[in-house]
Structure formats: C-alpha cells, structure tokens
Amino acid sequence: VTELFNNFKLSGWSQDWFAGYPVYYFYFPLPPIITSLLNFLLPFSISFKTMVLISQVLLVVSIEMLMRKSSKEFSFYGFGVGLLYLLTESFTIFGGNLASSLAGQYSFTYSIAFANLSIFYLIKSKHKYSTEIAALLIGLTVLSHLIPFMIYLPIFSFYFLKSDTIIYKKISAFLFFLFIAIRFSISLFLNLEFTTNMTYTPYTQISDLVKSDILPFVLGAVIYFILSSSKNSLKSISVFEIYLISISIYLFFYGPESALWNGRI
C-alpha cells in the first residue's frame, strides 16, 4: 500500500530476507493493487477481507457463466457446481475453494475466476467486443496467479485461434493482452531462479483425489450432462472439459515431485 502509490513501485514491496533470499520482493500484483485502491476508502483489514469475499462470489459466478447453455441463460447447474466447489474441504491451501482463500490463497481464486470468464467470453458470449474482453480477462489471470494461467493458456489459445473473429481483431486483442501482462511476466521470468520451491509432493492414490465432500460435485456434473437438452451447448464446452479432465489426470499421475513453484520472489 505504501510503496505502490507513494513510489509507483509494482515490485520491491519488501526488502526483507529469508535464508539468504529476498522474501516477497514481489507477488502477483492485481489483487494487492485493488486492495490498495480500496484502502483509500476503507481500513486495510476491511479492504483485504472485502477482496477475499469478492473472490468467492466471482468464482461461483464464473463457473455458472461457463456452464450456461447460452450467453444470457442462467445455469442453475453451474451455480450449484460452483457453490459445491467453493465449499469443498478436501484441500485447504492449494487455492480456489473457501478454505484455501481464507488461508491466504485468494489470488489463486481470482485467477481461476478470470480464466473461466475468459473462456466464456471466447466461446459463448455474443458481446461485440467479446474477443477483446477475453484477452483482458486472460491477462488478469496471469496478474492474479501463474499456475491457473499456465493450465488455461493452451485451451484459451486453441479457442482463440479457432474462432472466426477477423484477424485484425485477434491481433489487437493479443497486443492488448501483452500490454496488460508483459511487465509482470518479464520481471517474473528474469528472476525465476529466486522463486521459492513449495516442496510439493503429488498425490498418488485415488483416495487422495476423490474425497467424500466432492462427491456432490461429481454427482452434479453427471446430472448436468444427462439432463442437458442442448447438444450445441455440450459441443461448445466439450473440448474445454475434456482438456481440463485430461490435464488434471496427467498432472495427478505423472506430475513430478517438487515441481510446483511459487510465482513470487
């Protein structure tokens, strides 16, 4: 808060050291920037809690919108699935659900929400500037957290290149994305050697993956596909869903140990 607006610094917020390495030299900037803006109106503690609360609402909204049959038709299935995912307690620090966000991973939650919305605007929205909005949202994804961006980028690129949008709009959208993300991305990759290893150990048992509290999520997804009456709706999201399932299975069974790194310095 003090460094961003007084000195216009997007990095170097902390000059502290831990074990010989700079600690929190910078973090994903978007949520802290918004928190800093709110701090002009509210106490910092209230601003921070407000950002956490907004991330929870935005996550559920993004999943609901992503599962719509059309751009303006509310999806009760999507709302239910989003709510169940938010309330799952199988994990408490990986990010996305309520427990993880309250533990401090609300940046991850924002990243997932923005990524979901970017896919929605790319494949379902009828908005005149849907491609540009999608580019903005995928840029906000990387500014919120790196890991969801890395997972969503391939499928976003597939839909982006596959779309019938005229070429000059695609180029302008791509340049818009670069304008948003390039400053942070360059800083991150130039200093990648200083990022911290989370000593992540991947799960190897199915019982670790399928917990009792996510069974309603699985059941809701099955019911959605069975009862969906729109074949076009299923087609429009089938590639996206197959991709997410495939990449999740691959990372679950073949993700190397200690391969998950914090995008922070």
Positions of the model-derived regions?
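Membrane-embedded transmembrane-helix bundle of lipid-linked glycan/lipid transferases
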Residues: 1-265
